[in-house]
């Protein structure tokens, strides 16, 4: 519970000595007529995302042909995406059918913590997968030696640790603020919408959020970009056309996921303040939080031959 006072002209419309104990999401308040349709669409996407990621994790675990570093990282990404989806979608769906209950400050902080943790973990897992593709293409003879079990675990733990550290930093900085309003203009407890409810100037918090966003998006993007520059330069040196096609094919799924993931995340968290409507900002958030997690199983199922073959073996009951 936080006690806040009138602060400057910007707070004139807010009550003095307001006691805030919970928040109410207002993300879809302007879509009354479309709420049932949106519920059906998001429910379908939710089920597909969970089913797709669970199938990928199960297939990788059961099929010995997929017990390689590349698919180890894919299973970790699918697991992270599954939890990420569970953090946001259930409450969002309940709000669309009028069953949304106020969320306590502790509940909001918890949701924000897991959202940030797994969102950033996903970014660095994609970076680790980029390094894995670099080693596979540029140093194939030593691939299994370099990408040994110890290094793979270290890369995954590193990604998770960065996510945890950033989440603790962000959540602590946001929930130290005094709040004077309880209506969150969003469909979950994201950092910026919650900060807007504060009675005091949040410039320092906004600068901190921007710096962290740059570090956890631009740095991984840069590393992936460097990896693919080296990968492409190596592939172009391959003499046979068939060899080049095969090398490109091993990277196509990862590159597709990387482009969409980082593009959506950058638009959502690195774009400057503008006169965009709330609906426009929410559309970007929906794309990043609902559509992107579905992309991983769809791309790797439709574009990756080894995963498709493993699914065929699973259906045919021919696991190794």
Curated annotation (Swiss-Prot):
Main location: membrane
Record-level GO BP terms: detection of chemical stimulus involved in sensory perception of smell; G protein-coupled receptor signaling pathway; sensory perception of chemical stimulus; single fertilization
Keywords: Cell membrane, Disulfide bond, G-protein coupled receptor, Glycoprotein, Membrane, Olfaction, Receptor, Sensory transduction, Transducer, Transmembrane, Transmembrane helix
Keyword Signal: no
Entry's transmembrane regions: 37-57, 66-86, 111-131, 151-171, 208-227, 248-268, 282-302
Cytoplasmic side: 58-65, 132-150, 228-247, 303-320
Localization per record: Cell membrane
Chain positions carrying an annotated carbohydrate: 9, 16
Disulphide-bonded residues: 108-199
Gene3D superfamilies reported for this sequence: Rhodopsin 7-helix transmembrane proteins
Membrane-side (Extracellular) residue stretches: 1-36, 87-110, 172-207, 269-281
GO cellular component, one term: plasma membrane
PROSITE patterns in the cross-refs: G_PROTEIN_RECEP_F1_1, G_PROTEIN_RECEP_F1_2
GO molecular function, one term: G protein-coupled receptor activity
Membrane topology: Multi-pass membrane protein
One Pfam family from the record: 7tm_4
PANTHER family: OLFACTORY RECEPTOR
Homology family: Belongs to the G-protein coupled receptor 1 family.
Function text: Odorant receptor.
Protein's recorded name: Olfactory receptor 10J1
Organismal lineage: Eukaryota, Metazoa, Chordata, Craniata, Vertebrata
Gene of this entry: OR10J1
């Amino acid at each position: 519970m936080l006690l806040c006072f009138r602060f400057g002209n910007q707070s004139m419309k807010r009550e003095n000595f307001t006691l805030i104990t919970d928040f109410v999401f207002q993300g879809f308040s302007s879509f009354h007529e479309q709420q049932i349709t949106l519920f059906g669409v998001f429910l379908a996407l939710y089920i597909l995302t969970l089913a797709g990621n669970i199938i990928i994790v199960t297939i990788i675990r059961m099929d010995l042909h997929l017990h390689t570093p590349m698919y180890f990282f894919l299973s970790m990404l699918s697991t992270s995406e599954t939890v990420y989806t569970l953090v946001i979608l259930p409450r969002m769906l309940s709000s669309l059918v009028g069953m949304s209950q106020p969320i306590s400050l502790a509940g909001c902080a918890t949701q924000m913590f897991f959202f940030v943790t797994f969102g950033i973990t996903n970014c660095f897992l994609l970076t680790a997968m980029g390094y894995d593709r670099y080693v596979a293409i540029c140093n194939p003879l030593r691939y299994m030696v370099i990408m040994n079990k110890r290094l793979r675990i270290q890369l995954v733990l590193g990604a998770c640790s960065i996510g945890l550290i950033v989440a603790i930093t962000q959540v602590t900085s946001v929930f130290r603020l005094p709040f004077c309003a309880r209506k969150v203009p969003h469909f979950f407890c994201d950092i910026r919408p919650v900060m807007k409810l504060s009675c005091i100037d949040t410039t320092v918090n906004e600068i901190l959020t921007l710096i962290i966003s740059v570090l956890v998006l631009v740095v991984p993007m840069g590393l992936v970009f460097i990896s693919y520059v080296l990968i492409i330069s190596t592939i172009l040196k391959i003499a046979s056309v068939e060899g080049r096609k095969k090398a490109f094919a091993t990277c196509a799924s990862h590159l597709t996921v990387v482009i969409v993931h980082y593009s959506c995340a950058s638009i959502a968290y690195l774009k400057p303040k503008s006169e965009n409507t709330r609906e426009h900002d929410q559309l970007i958030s929906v794309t990043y939080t609902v559509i992107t997690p579905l992309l991983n199983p769809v791309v790797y199922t439709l574009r990756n031959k080894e995963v498709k073959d493993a699914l065929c073996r699973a259906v045919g009951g021919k696991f190794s």
